[in-house]
């Protein structure tokens, strides 16, 4: 039997600038939003930065020796996650934001966006695969990936969506890279 987990996204947040404060902000966002839970599931222990997060949110855990053993013995065999788009983070004033999803933040000037403000970033998928594998050395499965768009239903019931086909093709090619 193989046990997996579901992570709501990949480590797809880029610093908007090369300012070290932006780099550190992204690192903190990934630790809090992705790695905190993924590390527990895949490594069987709370990460070194967990106490900082607990303090930030006023959490006081009473972790028993039995809890430690349970975590160590309850790790997953594979990582599964959703990937739709990437985001940016910055400590600087933002003039243009991306919208339409939970990853709202500064708009990445190197990416294109769909009509709802989701970034189109197949390289971000490749990056997330690389990061997850480097961190966990476990099989990976992208279980959600797609493109939302306003489609036109033709009279014969078909939808002509070459833009969606191009999106899927680019993301499959990124996985093969």
Language model segments and positions:
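Active-site region of glycoside hydrolase catalytic domains
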Residues: 1-177
């Amino acid at each position: 039997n193989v046990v997996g987990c579901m992570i709501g996204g990949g480590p797809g947040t880029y610093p908007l600038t090369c300012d070290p404060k932006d780099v550190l902000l992204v690192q903190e966002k990934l630790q809090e939003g992705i790695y905190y839970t993924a590390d527990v599931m895949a490594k069987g222990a709370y990460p070194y930065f967990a106490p900082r997060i607990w303090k930030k949110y006023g959490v006081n855990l009473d972790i028993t020796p039995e809890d430690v053993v349970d975590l160590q013995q309850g790790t997953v065999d594979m990582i599964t996650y959703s990937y739709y788009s990437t985001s940016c983070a910055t400590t600087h004033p933002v003039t243009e934001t991306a919208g339409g999803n939970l990853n709202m933040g500064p708009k990445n000037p190197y990416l294109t966006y769909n009509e709802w403000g989701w970034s189109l970033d197949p390289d971000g998928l490749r990056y997330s695969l690389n990061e997850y594998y480097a961190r966990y050395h476990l099989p990976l499965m992208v279980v959600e990936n797609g493109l939302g768009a306003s489609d036109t239903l033709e009279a014969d019931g078909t939808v002509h969506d070459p833009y969606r086909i191009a999106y899927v093709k680019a993301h499959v090619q990124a996985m093969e890279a």
